[in-house]
């Protein structure tokens, strides 16, 4: 991520205004859809998904027509199996470095204070693989705050990390040829786990969690990539030492080259909080009146800019009909009477602190050697007839 220098912003902003005048463009709200409009399919459609058992229900960007993603259109990732859980026998265990180990039923959890959050969840590998650009969705999540449960269990002074164990499990093979079966798990620091925004979630868009999205209980940690929002939770442990497993120390680790005083240093970091990002979703038209619609998320978004081909950046209109601190913002820009032929559409988001979604040739993206945290500017191709 980089900052847009003031001079560059002024120059590009002025160019954008000139471009807007030449386009005779007008700003319009992103939703609802215009009556009679036709969606034009992107030329760069995804190839077949080679791992349908792992990635299910990717968002089809051209179909994006609402702020909240319906449950039946929400993506799901499973690293192991997709467990079938009987609510009547399911229990949540809380243990480790606590004074009072606790066991809760789903009824116990639902009887506790209720908290809701609208949060856009994105897989950290989204757009990092050629067959994967729909690992994202926005939902209204409801459950009970995590922090009071940990406080009631009595976290010991030695506790430093909280581990969330899922019911899903599979075989792990280490380089030394040791094989074993292990449940999925991720951890975060005790301080991060105690964030009052985190909830143990049992409801999605007003309905019980769907099986593929974590029934009966999952963690919802607003502002974090999807991997941290553990599904099918069965146990929560407070640890007195750092937790490492496949999904903390090997997978979901970003590798980058960084320049330090003229020397290249290879840096590995664990995937955690979401990064600023945007993407064009669809292009629609009524006759010669075209409109580009998209979304921006991952940080408090101040504005979104769009460019067509190698033209200047133009400001997009952000739809303020629905909004929440951790939900995506939908945006649009009108594109009157584009020339026939193939065009590219690129978007970039700018957050309230001035950080700009990086271009694909920005060193933070270009020198990244893993597909995690792929928040570079997204360019789509389209053909205008």
Which residues make up each language-model segment?
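Structured, non-membrane catalytic/scaffold regions adjacent to prosthetic-group chemistry
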Residues: 31-385
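N-terminal secretory signal peptides and thylakoid transit peptides that target proteins
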Residues: 1-17
């Amino acid at each position: 991520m980089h900052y847009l220098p003031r001079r560059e912003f002024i120059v590009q902003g002025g160019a954008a205004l000139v471009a807007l005048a030449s386009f005779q463009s007008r700003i319009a709200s992103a939703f609802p859809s215009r009556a009679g409009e036709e969606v034009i399919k992107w030329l760069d459609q995804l190839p077949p998904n080679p791992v349908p058992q792992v990635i299910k229900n990717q968002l089809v960007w051209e179909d994006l027509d609402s702020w909240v993603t319906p449950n039946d259109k929400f993506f799901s990732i499973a690293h192991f199996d997709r467990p079938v859980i009987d609510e009547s026998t399911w229990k949540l265990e809380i243990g480790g470095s606590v004074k009072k180990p606790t066991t809760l039923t789903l009824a116990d959890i639902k009887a506790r204070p209720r908290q809701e959050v609208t949060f856009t969840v994105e897989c950290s590998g989204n757009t990092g693989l050629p067959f994967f650009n729909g690992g994202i969705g926005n939902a209204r999540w409801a459950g009970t705050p995590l922090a009071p449960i940990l406080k009631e269990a009595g976290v010991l002074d030695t506790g430093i990390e909280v581990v969330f164990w899922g019911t899903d499990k599979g075989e792990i093979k280490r380089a030394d040829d040791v094989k074993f079966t292990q449940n999925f798990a991720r951890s975060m620091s005790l301080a991060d786990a105690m964030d009052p925004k985190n909830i143990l979630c049992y409801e999605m868009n007003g309905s019980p969690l769907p099986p593929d999205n974590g029934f009966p209980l999952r963690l919802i940690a607003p502002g974090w990539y999807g991997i941290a929002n553990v599904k099918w939770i069965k146990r929560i442990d407070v640890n007195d030492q750092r937790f490492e497993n496949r999904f903390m120390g090997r997978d979901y680790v970003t590798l980058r080259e960084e320049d330090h005083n003229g020397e290249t240093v290879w840096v590995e970091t664990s995937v955690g909080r979401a990064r600023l990002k945007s993407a064009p979703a669809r292009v629609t038209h009524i006759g010669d009146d075209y409109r580009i619609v998209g979304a921006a998320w991952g940080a408090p978004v101040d504005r979104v800019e769009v460019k067509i081909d190698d033209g200047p950046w133009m400001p997009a209109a952000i739809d303020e009909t629905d909004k929440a601190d951790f939900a995506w913002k939908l945006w649009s820009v009108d594109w009157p009477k584009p020339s026939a032929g193939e065009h590219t559409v690129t978007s970039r988001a700018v957050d309230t602190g001035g950080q700009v979604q990086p271009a694909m040739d920005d060193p933070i993206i270009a020198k990244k050697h893993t597909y995690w945290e792929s928040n570079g500017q997204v360019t789509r191709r389209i053909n205008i007839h």
